[in-house]
């Protein structure tokens, strides 16, 4: 039985726990619609996967981020890419398709999504370019080589970004780029903690620690990008980045 044969039960389970703040864009709705409809659309298997994800309520990067990543990959042509958070493999396949000479390592712990990703990598014949590592990111990251990756994309548990960051910074090359997705949390990050729902405060606190560690840190060049639910972009400027003694 293929992964798609058991799709309904898998998707229902995943969707209950997925982060849906990407549906609360911080940019004006009409501008979001403009970016999603006027920029070049996906074709072929990427269009198929994007439509499947939308139909089944599986979070993948929205189309304005797709267009941005398409530009980044074609311009930077990174040789080694690391992704934390595979889901169904859409973003890994997008990066692979637009940087054909890259080698991509992607990490995920969710067995349901791993099943989809494996099938998609095989179905679209990207198994030689994309390596999927199964397990907890904090267990896997220390086993990967340091100063190796040109580009790292983090799209996993937002409260854990600050926990993963010290290891991730070891893995990226000096001059390399790290992008962290969904960091505005629908605008919550700009609020006082007393205005945040209790169930969201762990994420809020984790993101505030992330901002404290990076936004004014000379060891990295940081930029917040108001695209979808926000991107944090980091360029590693020196080999040993000091995260300002932030308690991890």
Where are these regions (language model features)?
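A short alpha-helical cap/connector motif
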Residues: 1-151, 158-179, 183-248
